[in-house]
């Protein structure tokens, strides 16, 4: 796949045609949380407590992530593994290589969501550049940038209109 836009992500969620990997980062906290919530809710519809493990990346190992990914879904079609703030670059080159291999071998019944809330992704650094490139090759990368003023006006106007309220742009 590749780096995708907000519209492409929302279309995947609507059509329920998911990638095996979502790599979500960026400066807009609201968008990151919104996308993760929408993905998780849409992927796992049965027994979320069993099919949607949440892993705190600060205390996680690649082995733990791998173990969760390779478990089969229980009484559900899909399993969603959510990993927050896993700083693989700080773990070293060997961990980066292992993670890249893991990205390429995610089972069809599992969706891995890696979201970075406090870990800063600097694509200029070679470690993160390789990880983002591998994520892009094997799944979807979403960079949650702040919206421009024009985009915000359009978003808020549309949001209000759906709720029966009209907002004047002046």
Residue ranges and their predicted role:
Residues 1-170:
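Conserved beta/loop motifs at nucleotide-recognition and modification sites
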């Amino acid at each position: 796949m590749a780096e995708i836009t907000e519209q492409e992500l929302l279309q995947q969620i609507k059509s329920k045609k998911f990638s095996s990997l979502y790599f979500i980062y960026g400066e807009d906290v609201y968008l990151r949380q919104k996308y993760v919530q929408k993905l998780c809710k849409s992927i796992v519809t049965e027994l979320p407590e069993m099919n949607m493990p949440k892993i705190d990346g600060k205390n996680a190992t690649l082995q733990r992530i791998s173990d969760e990914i390779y478990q089969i879904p229980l009484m559900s079609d899909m399993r969603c593994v959510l990993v927050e703030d896993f700083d693989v670059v700080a773990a070293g080159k060997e961990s980066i290589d292992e993670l890249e291999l893991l990205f390429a071998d995610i089972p069809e019944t599992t969706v891995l969501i890696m979201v970075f809330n406090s870990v800063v992704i600097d694509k200029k650094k070679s470690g993160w550049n390789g990880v983002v490139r591998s994520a892009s090759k094997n799944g979807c990368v979403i960079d949650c940038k702040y919206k421009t003023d024009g985009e915000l006006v359009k978003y808020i106007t549309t949001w209000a209109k759906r709720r029966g309220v009209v907002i004047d742009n002046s």
